[in-house]
């Protein structure tokens, strides 16, 4: 089920289940994974995009392997907060996932991904990562920034 706010999303995530964060690009999908306590996110891998069915199968395998309870998708808003074609494509991807049987039990939510790739790039440069290695991991690291932002918000919601 798709949730527009993290408040609603939080209530739908089963206890002791991690989350997967996705940074959808046109050629790749960056994937990050949280711990089961929903405190920290780590870059997991980058999936090369093919067709939706192949992409969804790859994600379903990761979800089953890591016993995930929900998905956070980075929503690429414009700097003024409006949604453009990339945000619409992300929403369509989420809708298509929610219609598949192997994703029906999962909570799907969105998190503003503005500047996540910039932050990931800066962190990788600061860590003295080679240009080649940066290009291999940038999407997964960006997904971890997106997921960590959502986890921090969820922790704040639980504290209130």
Swiss-Prot record:
Main localization of the protein described in the UniProt heading: cytoplasm
Gene3D superfamilies: YqgF/RNase H-like domain (3.30.420.140)
InterPro entries, A to Z: RNaseH-like_sf, YqgF, YqgF/RNaseH-like_dom, YqgF/RNaseH-like_dom_sf
A GO molecular-function annotation: nuclease activity
Entries under SMART domains matching the protein: YqgFc (SM00732)
Record family assignment: Belongs to the YqgF nuclease family.
Keywords, alphabetical: Cytoplasm, Hydrolase, Nuclease, Ribosome biogenesis
One annotated GO biological process: rRNA 5'-end processing
UniProt protein name: Putative pre-16S rRNA nuclease
Catalytic activity, EC: 3.1.-.-
GO CC terms of this entry: cytosol
Domain of life: Bacteria
Compartments, record wording: Cytoplasm
UniProt function note: Could be a nuclease involved in processing of the 5'-end of pre-16S rRNA.
